[in-house]
C-alpha cells in the first residue's frame, strides 16, 4: 500500500487495547529476542512461553525460521530482504500486542536500526529487547542446523557472525548470558516481567 494513498483510512475499533489487557489480566508487550544463530534465542523464548502459559498468560511465539515458511516466504537474505522480514514481523507483533498478548519473537535481527524501527512501531514500554549474548565460538560448537559449517565452507553467503555483521544491542532491557542454563534465563525474564508489572502471577 502506498503511504500517500488518501483513500485508505484508519478504522478505529470499539474495543480498546486497554480493555483487551484487562480481559487477559496482564499487559500486552513484545519481548524481542536477538542474538547470533545458535545463541539460544528460540530455546529460551520457548521456555519462557511454556512458563507463562502455565501461569495463565496469553502468549504467542514468532520464530525466525517459522515465519519464512509463510509470511516471509518470498524473502531472501539480502540486507533489503532482511529489513523487510523484520518490518513485517514487527507489524504482526504490534497487532498482537494491541490484542493484549505477551509476544515473544526470536530473530537474529542483526542491525540496531531495524530493532529500533520495531521499538518505535510498538512504542516504549511495550518493547523489551532481550539480548541472548553467547560467544561466537559457543554458537559454532552448538551449530544445531549445520549452518556455521556451511558458512565456513563458503556454501552459505551473508551468514551473520561469519561474513555478515551482527550489531549487539547497546542498551537492551535485559542482557542474558547465553551459556547459563535455560531455566535460569527463563527465571530472569519472569522476574523482569513481574518487576515491570507486566504480569502479576
Curated annotation (Swiss-Prot):
Its EC number is 2.7.1.25. It catalyses: adenosine 5'-phosphosulfate + ATP = 3'-phosphoadenylyl sulfate + ADP + H(+). Residues 1-23 are annotated as: Disordered. GO terms for biological process: hydrogen sulfide biosynthetic process; sulfate assimilation. CDD domains: APSK. The keyword ATP-binding applies. Pfam families: APS_kinase. Belongs to the APS kinase family. HAMAP family: Adenylyl_sulf_kinase. This is Adenylyl-sulfate kinase. It comes from Escherichia coli O6:K15:H31 (strain 536 / UPEC).
